[in-house]
């Protein structure tokens, strides 16, 4: 999943995967998720993930794996989630804690947007 997170306030935002089965990464930022106006292009090969969770074959990951990113209000910030699952059915619960301590879970309407690659608006790149 790719999109642009629009922070309502200038502050730190904590993204969280409640449970990962089998692997998931979250990348936030222009040099990590995807380049300016390149949401539909091949991925950047950065391994500087905001959250990196890969479950061992014979074990499990801790719950609530989190990563925090500082963002500026009103600037669209690229984000990408890559999720894989093997053997059995599962989902990836995703949430973000806003500066006012409100938690947004799974439905990111009003927070994450998608645009054509010819976007001309200002984007934030940390």
From Swiss-Prot:
Superkingdom in the source lineage: Eukaryota
Pfam families, A to Z: PA14
Positions of the PA14 domain: 1-110
InterPro entries given in the database record: PA14/GLEYA, PA14_dom
Signal peptide span: none
Transmembrane segments: none
Record note on disruption phenotype: Leads to cell death when overexpressing the camptothecin mimetic TOP1-T(722)A mutant.
Family indicated by similarity: Belongs to the flocculin family.
Entry protein name: Topoisomerase I damage affected protein 8
Gene: TDA8
């Amino acid at each position: 999943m790719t999109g642009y997170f629009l922070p309502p306030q200038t502050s730190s935002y904590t993204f969280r995967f409640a449970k990962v089965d089998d692997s998931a990464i979250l990348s936030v930022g222009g040099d990590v998720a995807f380049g300016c106006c390149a949401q539909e292009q091949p991925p950047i090969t950065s391994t500087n993930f905001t959250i990196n969770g890969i479950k061992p074959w014979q074990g499990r990951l801790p719950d609530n794996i989190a990563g925090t990113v500082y963002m500026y209000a009103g600037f669209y910030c690229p984000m990408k989630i890559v999720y894989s699952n093997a053997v059995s059915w599962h989902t990836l619960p995703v949430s973000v804690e806003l500066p006012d301590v409100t938690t947004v879970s799974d439905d990111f309407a009003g927070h994450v947007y998608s645009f054509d690659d010819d976007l001309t608006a200002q984007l934030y790149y940390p």
